[in-house]
Amino acid sequence: AGSYYSYRRRRCSPRRLYRLRRRRYRSSRRRRRRPCRRRRHRRVCRRVRRRRRCCRRR
C-alpha cells in the first residue's frame, strides 16, 4: 500500500487532483456508472479511471 501511495503522490499533486475530481465528478457522475454493471468489475473500473484521470494530462 505504501508504494502505491508514494507512486500516486509522485505522479499527481494533491491540489490538482482535488480540483480535477470536483470538476469531473458533476459532469461524469451519471455517465460513468453505466459501463461497469457487474459487481466484480466496478472496483477495477474505478481504480483505472482514477489513475487515468489524475495522471493522463500534464
Swiss-Prot record:
One of its GO terms (biological process) is spermatogenesis. Its main location: nucleus. Transmembrane segments: none annotated. GO terms for cellular component: nucleosome; nucleus. It is found in: Nucleus; Chromosome. GO terms for molecular function: DNA binding. Keywords: Chromosome, Developmental protein, Differentiation, DNA condensation, DNA-binding, Nucleosome core, Nucleus, Spermatogenesis. Testis. Residues 20-41 are annotated as: Disordered. Belongs to the protamine P2 family. Protamines substitute for histones in the chromatin of sperm during the haploid phase of spermatogenesis. They compact sperm DNA into a highly condensed, stable and inactive complex. This is Sperm histone P2b. It comes from Equus caballus.
